[in-house]
Swiss-Prot record:
Residues bound to Zn(2+) 3: 174, 176, 190, 192
InterPro entries membership: AN1-like_Znf (IPR035896), AN1_A20_ZnFinger (IPR050652), Znf_A20 (IPR002653), Znf_AN1 (IPR000058)
Biased composition (Polar residues): 78-96, 113-127
GO terms for MF: DNA binding; zinc ion binding
Tissues with expression: Expressed in testis.
Taxonomic source organism: Mus musculus (Mouse)
Protein name: AN1-type zinc finger protein 3
Renumbered zinc finger spans (AN1-type): 151-200
Region feature Disordered, mapped onto this chain: 41-99, 113-151
Gene3D superfamilies: 1.20.5.4770, AN1-like Zinc finger
Statement: the UniProt record of this protein carries the keyword Metal-binding: yes
Record's keyword terms, sorted: Metal-binding, Zinc, Zinc-finger
Length: 227
């Protein structure tokens, strides 16, 4: 009676676990019902049942062999894919090598027109540049070079020989090199040999406002420049 009471006082222990993961039983050699049935089918009727330790070791060995077989089966499946990769690379590599010179020729063909266009632009600019540049006017003829005689005294008018003051000498000096009085200082009054109209055109061209090439391409709001 004392032994029975001590056994009842003990906590219930967990059943043994089968190698497959399910709960086993001591009656079925610590195996689940399915594993125990498979084990009985494999064992012949005449042979005696082995011990529990041997059965467990056999099950573990079978599981390890099955795992090894699975790994051996899966490994060959990867090898063909790995072997196919170099073949694909070998197939694609000639295409890239063949396309290499094609791309070089394409680059050359694309670059050559740009060089020609730059040359054409430079020629057009050189042709247009003389039009924009002002014409050079020859130096005015000196009194010595022209058929007219040299003025002896700058204190008197070259046309009427009237005496001139200092202010009249400064105001009456002409670009042809002679000094005239107030009555003959205009070019029409003393038959001036200097090309005043050509000089005026030249000065107008020099003072002309040159338009910037960027005009019309940039956007600017009205009133931004004033702020």
């Amino acid at each position: 009676m004392g032994d029975a009471g001590s056994e009842r006082s003990k906590a219930p222990s967990l059943p043994p676990r089968c190698p497959c993961g399910f709960w086993g039983s001591s009656k079925t050699m610590n195996l689940c019902s399915k594993c125990f049935a498979d084990f009985q089918k494999k064992q012949p009727d005449d042979d005696s049942t082995p011990s529990t330790s041997n059965s467990q070791s056999d099950l573990f060995s079978e599981e390890t062999t099955s795992d090894n077989n699975n790994t051996s089966v899966t490994t060959p499946t990867l090898s063909p894919s790995q072997q196919s990769l170099p073949t694909e690379l070998n197939v694609t590599s000639p295409s890239t090598e063949e396309c290499g010179p094609c791309t070089d020729t394409a680059h050359v063909s694309l670059i050559t027109p740009t060089k020609r266009s730059c040359g054409a632009d430079s020629q057009s600019e050189n042709e247009a540049s003389p039009v924009k540049r002002p014409r050079l006017v020859e130096n005015p003829e000196r009194p010595e070079e022209s058929g007219r005689s040299k003025q002896k005294s700058r204190r008197r008018c070259f046309q009427c020989q009237t005496k001139l003051e200092l202010v009249q000498q400064e105001l009456g000096s002409c670009r042809c090199g002679y000094v005239f009085c107030m009555l003959h200082r205009l070019p029409e009054q003393h038959d001036c040999t200097f090309d005043h109209m050509g000089r005026g055109r030249e000065e107008a061209i020099m003072k002309m406002v040159k338009l910037d090439r960027k005009v019309g391409r940039s956007c600017q709001r009205i009133g931004e420049g004033c702020s």
